[in-house]
From Swiss-Prot:
Assembly, per entry: Component of the small ribosomal subunit. Mature ribosomes consist of a small (40S) and a large (60S) subunit. The 40S subunit contains about 33 different proteins and 1 molecule of RNA (18S). The 60S subunit contains about 49 different proteins and 3 molecules of RNA (28S, 5.8S and 5S). Part of the small subunit (SSU) processome, composed of more than 70 proteins and the RNA chaperone small nucleolar RNA (snoRNA) U3.
Major localisation: cytoplasm
Source organism: Danio rerio
Record-level GO BP terms: chordate embryonic development; ribosomal small subunit biogenesis; translation
The protein's name in its UniProt record: Small ribosomal subunit protein eS1
Location relative to the cell: Cytoplasm; Nucleus; Nucleus, Nucleolus
Gene name tied to this protein: rps3a
Record key words, sorted: Cytoplasm, Nucleus, Ribonucleoprotein, Ribosomal protein
Keyword Oxidoreductase attached: no
GO CC list: cytosol; cytosolic small ribosomal subunit; nucleolus; small-subunit processome
Protein function: Component of the small ribosomal subunit. The ribosome is a large ribonucleoprotein complex responsible for the synthesis of proteins in the cell. Part of the small subunit (SSU) processome, first precursor of the small eukaryotic ribosomal subunit. During the assembly of the SSU processome in the nucleolus, many ribosome biogenesis factors, an RNA chaperone and ribosomal proteins associate with the nascent pre-rRNA and work in concert to generate RNA folding, modifications, rearrangements and cleavage as well as targeted degradation of pre-ribosomal RNA by the RNA exosome.
Claim: rRNA-binding is one of the keywords in the record: no
Region feature Disordered, mapped onto this chain: 234-267
InterPro entries reported in the protein's UniProt record: Ribosomal_eS1, Ribosomal_eS1_CS, Ribosomal_eS1_euk
Amino acid sequence: MAVGKNKRLTKGGKKGAKKKIVDPFSKKDWYDVKAPAMFNIRNLGKTLVTRTQGTRIASDGLKGRVFEVSLADLQNDEVAFRKFKLVTEDVQGKNCLTNFHGMDLTRDKMCSMVKKWQTMIEAHVDVKTTDGYLLRLFCVGFTKKRTNQIRKTSYAQHQQVRQIRKKMMEIMTREVQTNDLKEVVNKLIPDSVGKDIEKACQSIYPLHDVYVRKVKMLKKPKFELGKLMELHGEGGSTSAAAKPAEGDTGAKVERADGYEPPIQESV
């Protein structure tokens, strides 16, 4: 056996020695997620992000994050089958300011509506709002039995389906084209568009369960902080607070260089 030093022992301990465990949450911060002013519940929850280190800025990691929230949580409501997507567009202090990014129906709601002995009619259309957002809206509706109908099935003819689909596209285009994004979202919350379609198609074939089932955001205009602040109900107040009222400007006081106020004996 050769006599010599054991190299492994001189290198300082075992090869598989335990490393110091660092808690990953110690390098992260919590930020509040704020919904736009269209919704009743503004505080959605909190999100986690790694603190600013060198060139990696925390706010850059938050911008573009998409949160999917049930409408019941946003409106403090019982009806919970609509989900809204909100995207973080700016970070102010510890608050993530979000904007509308899309809408969807839950899978269980969609499955519960699809049944036998009826016709399902779907339509989709790409529309641009007045403030430059390009949206793709998907609509769904189902035929129902006429009053005093004895027959089990309620199938619509192909020509009637085409007429209903055309009417769906017309109403969706009209409702979005003439409004900005804020007004469109205000119409999506109670789904007034679906009710309008149901009423308009009554003369062609009676419908039920008519919903705008999905809204996709295809294109957005260039980001403007002022417009986002308006959506959050802070645009007008900040600019008004910054400007002093007329007559409140005050008079300039002339003081010598190195002036210090006298020390008061009592406060």
